[in-house]
UniProtKB/Swiss-Prot annotation:
Subcellular location: Cytoplasm
Gene: trpR
Protein name in UniProt: Trp operon repressor
Any one GO cellular component localisation term in the record: cytoplasm
Family recorded in the similarity comment: Belongs to the TrpR family.
NCBIfam families: TrpR
Amino acid sequence: MTDEKQVSDSLNRQTAGNPYSAADPALSAEDNQHWLSFVALLQNAITQDLHLPLLQLMLTPDERTALGTRVRIIEELMRGELSQRELKSQLGAGIATITRGSNSLKTAPPQLKSWLEAQLLANKR
């Protein structure tokens, strides 16, 4: 079995019946397939404890920093104690980045919001 076929089969197994695996409307069909291939690769890397070196290979230091900042933005927005302007000052992020995070959070599925709350806020209150 070719590597491409293995990834395709893995994606099909992982996304079957999953309502969150639908095509990303922001991506072309081809780009969505590439995205899902990356997600499958990352999932496999996690099971083999290779996720950190994979992410270091795939993301520049600036991209890794940006992801960390986005996690902090979502965390603080969920906590709800700071205004977007205060977040901008505290995190050094642009107001547009914070607004995008806020808008994305508003449209996130309830199950994801609950999971994020448990992951990001449970031990930090």
